[in-house]
Amino acid sequence: MLPTENRLRRREDFATAVRRGRRAGRPLLVVHLRSGATDPHAPGESAPPTRAGFVVSKAVGGAVVRNQVKRRLRHLVCDRLSALPPGSLVVVRALPGAGDADHAQLARDLDAALQRLLGGGTR
């Protein structure tokens, strides 16, 4: 389960991540990443948490399939939060093929997209 402080909820936060962040597309999903502030934090001030949100449209499938895809993506992102810069906003948008994909395929696409966004991969 994704902890409460790591959930992206407000429309403005989703819009910021999608419009001002970097994007990496894969066959099953698209990941938008808006990196956190680059300014060093004052002593005693903790870094803001990385927050993630998910977009799974009706094109992915019916309600049961959409919720299953969201649960899988939440679990995958939760395991990868420590690899993301503090204060980042992440939006994972599932594409229609995600409804037919298994956990391993979603994990592979998510890892490839995050690696590309964090500077470790090529197109």
Curated annotation (Swiss-Prot):
Keywords from the UniProt entry: Endonuclease, Hydrolase, Nuclease, RNA-binding, tRNA processing
Organism: Streptomyces bikiniensis
Main function: RNaseP catalyzes the removal of the 5'-leader sequence from pre-tRNA to produce the mature 5'-terminus. It can also cleave other RNA substrates such as 4.5S RNA. The protein component plays an auxiliary but essential role in vivo by binding to the 5'-leader sequence and broadening the substrate specificity of the ribozyme.
SUPFAM superfamilies for this protein: Ribosomal protein S5 domain 2-like
Alphabetized HAMAP family for the sequence: RNase_P
GO cellular-component term (any): ribonuclease P complex
Subunit structure: Consists of a catalytic RNA component (M1 or rnpB) and a protein subunit.
UniProt KW RNA-binding keyword: yes
EC code: 3.1.26.5
Family: Belongs to the RnpA family.
Domain of life: Bacteria
Protein name: Ribonuclease P protein component
Any one Gene Ontology BP term: tRNA 5'-leader removal
Keyword Aminoacyl-tRNA synthetase listed: no
Listed Pfam families: Ribonuclease_P
GO MF annotations in UniProt: 3'-tRNA processing endoribonuclease activity; ribonuclease P activity; tRNA binding
Gene3D superfamilies (UniProt xref): 3.30.230.10
